[in-house]
Amino acid sequence: VEVTPGEDSRAIVVDLGDLATGLGRGASVAIAGVCLTAVEIDGSRVRFEIMGETLERTTLGNFQAGSEVNIERSAKVGDEIGGHRVSGHVAGRARISKIERPEGNCVMTFVCESDWMQYILPKGFIALDGCSLTVVDVGNTPPPGGASWFTAHFIPETLRITTFGIKKVGDEVNLEIDPETQTIVETVRRYLESHGPQHLS
């Protein structure tokens, strides 16, 4: 990554390698799980412009020259879809609070704003830095220092091909809520607010 700061924005240049093949100006690319638009292309080097709101909501404002990022091109009709649908519309950030490495596995615990936890459910989907993951467990740490948390497991292959292999405690990641889960939770919540729980059967 190369970074050019602006007054209320910044531009980054990312070397996409082979993923730049066939990429056109105006195409969408997920950088660390954030949907960005390619504005200039020079071989495998692609320039993206990032507005102030995106910098505030995501971790892109923390990027420095030489940073490694997860990259994903947009899906095409007919592509195999593994995991769940990821749009690149980031809700906010989560922070790694613990990393455990049992044999042949890696378990990371993340903390985030409590408002998002209503959409983060055990065995549900979540996207972190653009990686489709399954939530293993959720909970709340009691005060003092209480926080809402969730865990995800990483197999060695995921650690190898993504930046999670170099993450450490305290690092922040971009958090995207599964839109289907969010829709269901919001629909039920609004129904209960309008009709009350006595109408459920």
Describe the residue ranges of each PLM region.
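Conserved loop->alpha-helix
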Residues: V1-S201
